[in-house]
Each structure stands twice: as structure tokens, then as C-alpha cells.
Amino acid sequence: MKVIFLVDVKGKGKKGEIKEVPTGYAQNFLIKKNLAREASSQAIGQLRGQQKAEEKAQAEILAEAKAVKKILDDEKTRVQFKEKVGPDGRTFGSITAKKISEELQKQFKVKVDKRHIVLDHPIRAIGLIEVPVKLHKEVIAEIKLNIAEA
């Protein structure tokens, strides 16, 4: 019996995959537990439509990420921070991914999720710093931060 897997089933198939499995296994386990459904021509057509829509959505997300990367990679795009600095040359407060995201939104009207900003630890130094941003699994940009003394 041919079935379309609705979820990943270890050792049998991945979501969206069409596979031939024993009839008893399909009827008594996969279909009963909503892990798969019978691969009729209508169900296969519906699956193809869903896959096309998903591909289109992924292409749009990728295009949007590339557009944001182009803005961030521009030399004029420098996020300005003015922080109080102690005698040792380190800032009193640290600059976190959340702060960077908020300032980017304020200064350049570019929305970047704070979880996409890759910071090993909060920034406490002054000067020009480049921070990587993972906009998409294929697109990585760099934000230039200019941290000055207030």
C-alpha cells in the first residue's frame, strides 16, 4: 500500500514522502495514529500543491534575508551607541543582542530578530565592532557597531 507520511517516522520515511509499506502496517499503525495517509491521486495532488507553496514561501524568506543583508553590508549602515565608560576603558552597561536589534530598528528601520544576532558574550568594549547576523541558513551578514564614549 502506498502512503504519504504526515510526520517523520524513524526508519520508515520522512514527512511528505510517498512510500510503499505493508498494507497491515499502514492500516493498523500509520493511518490509525495519523502518521500517514493513503496515497490517492487527490492526496498526492494536494501534497504537490503544499510543497510548491512551501518552496515559494522559502524563496520569499530567502529574498527578504538577502535584501536585509544588502542593507547591513552597506558601509553607511553603522549602528551608533553612546555608553558611559569606566576608567578601565570598558562600558558600564553591556551591549546585548536585544539592544543591537532595537537600535537597528530605531536608526535604520531594519527589523532583525535578537535571536539571529550571534554574540558569544555581551559587548563591553568601545570602538568599531562587527557582529555576525544569521538572517537565514544560507545568508549571514555583519552589523557594524560604533560604540563611543558618552
From Swiss-Prot:
* Keywords noted in UniProt: Ribonucleoprotein, Ribosomal protein, RNA-binding, rRNA-binding
GO MF assignments: rRNA binding; structural constituent of ribosome
* Gene Ontology terms: biological process: translation
Any one annotated GO CC term: ribosome
The UniProt entry, under InterPro entries, shows: Ribosomal_bL9, Ribosomal_bL9/RNase_H1_N, Ribosomal_bL9_bac/chp, Ribosomal_bL9_C, Ribosomal_bL9_C_sf, Ribosomal_bL9_N, Ribosomal_bL9_N_sf
Functional summary from the UniProt entry: Binds to the 23S rRNA.
Q: Which family does it belong to?
A: Belongs to the bacterial ribosomal protein bL9 family.
Cited HAMAP family: Ribosomal_bL9
Q: What is this protein called?
A: Large ribosomal subunit protein bL9
